[in-house]
Amino acid sequence: MAARRVSSLLSRSFSASSPLLFRSQGRNCYNGGILRRFGTSSAAAEEIINPSVQVSHTQLLINGNFVDSASGKTFPTLDPRTGEVIAHVAEGDAEDINRAVKAARTAFDEGPWPKMSAYERSRVLLRFADLVEKHSEELASLETWDNGKPYQQSLTAEIPMFARLFRYYAGWADKIHGLTIPADGNYQVHTLHEPIGVAGQIIPWNFPLLMFAWKVGPALACGNTIVLKTAEQTPLTAFYAGKLFLEAGLPPGVLNIVSGFGATAGAALASHMDVDKLAFTGSTDTGKVILGLAANSNLKPVTLELGGKSPFIVFEDADIDKAVELAHFALFFNQGQCCCAGSRTFVHEKVYDEFVEKSKARALKRVVGDPFRKGIEQGPQIDLKQFEKVMKYIKSGIESNATLECGGDQIGDKGYFIQPTVFSNVKDDMLIAQDEIFGPVQSILKFSDVDEVIKRANETKYGLAAGVFTKNLDTANRVSRALKAGTVWVNCFDVFDAAIPFGGYKMSGNGREKGIYSLNNYLQIKAVVTALNKPAWI
């Protein structure tokens, strides 16, 4: 039940009305209160809400202790609402990765965690989930402050799912076992499912806590130890979660957390000879680098969850109002900063014009502002680099002669707020239809028939997710099977239950996270063959 409740907050379906987290307050976001609030830097400063949470952990977590980086260096983590410094955190580098890997190796080879009964490991994960719920407001505040996503999204959707994921993996801890295999001859054969060892994990900035759970949960349930590198933009919630894990009774060295930059700390972790497994979520280009570093070191196995350019297909039989709302959610959720965002909206030619007009109207009603305010649907982009990238793609769309229906500009002159932007008359060869923008930019394309849209939807290097909106079950089944994507949502989108596997085809990555399949990422399978002398039953 908990999973279904959380999923309903993160999805849109035929039967649902506008979700509570993202409901419009009926204001025009371009000529109403938002521009008045963000029209000048002074007005923006007056309206900014200061979260009550204290930033108490900014050091690296190594071997059960919060410590400074070996170099003593720090770097700032910034508030996306203003671009101002929230706190300075320890800047880990290769030496700190070495320290963390050494702690994780010792904890795996000599510590109690892998030898602990699976039931006892599950109890630690359950205690951690309880502590997450106890400190949900602090975690949600830090997540929103560091990332810019709406506070209500953090508090009522992401934190409950964060706790749910760890309870899910706690349930798996004592159900991981091998098989007895009938083999020819006088032999008894069974398999052992053993923890893989020291797992290196690199998480992104768009969903810091959820990606923490997707990786840390299965690794711990299987009995591994971990070195986790945070995204440099969003280190704060990982450190807070690390503190809660220590309170829950996780032994020292089992979970080590290093903040730092990809070129230094990330590269050192990916190429480390004493790391047995690597998991990475981020861009496809960086994923290629990570895979190369892993291959050129000790050939450690790598799980990759990478970029996407997901098609969202609206057929002519669709309820247009519901399809517009779902397509809007599929793209604009989390400021458009979702790897699986429905960023290519394909609409049948018979309903195209109506769909475009209603999509424009919905975007104009989207409430953009300080994510700590009630009723806000969209906060700022994560940082200046991402802001400039999105604005570059908007300019490209205009120059490519796509029709700019609305948006396309910055809101205010402080922070990284972008108007919800809708393009129509988009062609497949335009950059806005090919590249992962990772921002609030909806591209609406026209199609004529099923075969055509299947072909066009699959003509991308990505294959992470897709959405299909139709009342026809035959169409839904046909298209779902034909699309080359790791997840296909039919009449819904962004449904993320703890048990549903997630991962990509093609250049969207390999392996699966969440669900039973994620356990395979962190297990070694050993076959044990024993000769039998005069077995009674042969």
From Swiss-Prot:
TM stretches of this protein: none
Gene3D superfamilies registered for this protein in UniProt: Aldehyde Dehydrogenase, Chain A, domain 1, Aldehyde Dehydrogenase, Chain A, domain 2
GO cellular component: a single term: cytosol
Keywords: Mitochondrion, NAD, Oxidoreductase, Transit peptide
EC number(s) stated in the UniProt entry for this protein: 1.2.1.3
Site (Transition state stabilizer): residue numbering on this chain: N206
A single GO molecular function term of this UniProt record: ATP binding
Cellular location(s): Mitochondrion matrix
Enzyme class per UniProt: oxidoreductase
The keyword Iron-sulfur is assigned to this record: no
The keyword Magnesium appears for this protein: no
Main location: mitochondrion
Superkingdom: Eukaryota
Transit peptide: 1-38
Alphabetized InterPro entries for the sequence: Ald_DH/histidinol_DH, Ald_DH_C, Ald_DH_CS_CYS, Ald_DH_CS_GLU, Ald_DH_N, Aldehyde_DH_dom
Function: Possesses activity on acetaldehyde and glycolaldehyde in vitro.
Protein family (similarity comment): Belongs to the aldehyde dehydrogenase family.
Oligomer status and interactors: Homotetramer.
Protein name per UniProt: Aldehyde dehydrogenase family 2 member B4, mitochondrial
